[in-house]
């Protein structure tokens, strides 16, 4: 499933379209190499699974994926989880059931729950909003018109924080070289020890690369 592709492409472009920022031009987008680029590209299952882990442990507290069915975690060519693994993951969430008029544990046929903490946008279609290459199922023609795609933008955004901050009108903004206008209201989401992978991969640059893939 394209949406759970890398590690964090999940914090998509449109994702920041609703974030407040100080005026300015377009930001710098690094040309990352993704395995799924171009008509012959393929998805890296391990990368997608890491991306889901980053989303679950870092992003999901503020951002939902309400248009993504949980069952897609078992898609062939995507994350490839077993039915049992998908059911176990689904139970991590609670969803509102209109028939019960109450919340219950999610099942694979449900979608990821919506999360709108602090007005944070849903990530379901964010990467698509700035898509260039659409993985092995697309032609890449969009990139010729729109420049580098959603995965590159998201990975660049996640790694583009400079550490500089400023306060305007009672709000704190963070300098980010990839964000249009250079100043974004979202604090850096990735730190050195925020996610532990089974294979000991924990570098911010790689973790940003993977979520980006995951969401495309």
Predicted regions and their residues:
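Sequence/structural segment immediately N-terminal to covalent heme-attachment motifs in c-type
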Residues: 43-65
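Acidic/histidine-rich catalytic neighborhood
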Residues: 38, 68-69, 81-106
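Short cysteine/histidine-rich zinc-coordinating motifs and their immediately flanking basic loops
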Residues: 71-76
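Membrane-proximal low-complexity regions enriched in glycine and acidic/polar residues
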Residues: 93-180
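Conserved small/polar residues in nucleotide/adenosyl-binding loops
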Residues: 204-211
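Post-cleavage N-terminal segment of exported redox proteins
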Residues: 2-7, 12-42
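Mobile gating loops/cap/lid regions near enzyme active sites that modulate substrate access
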Residues: 177-190
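Detector for the c-type heme attachment site
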Residues: 63-68, 128, 187
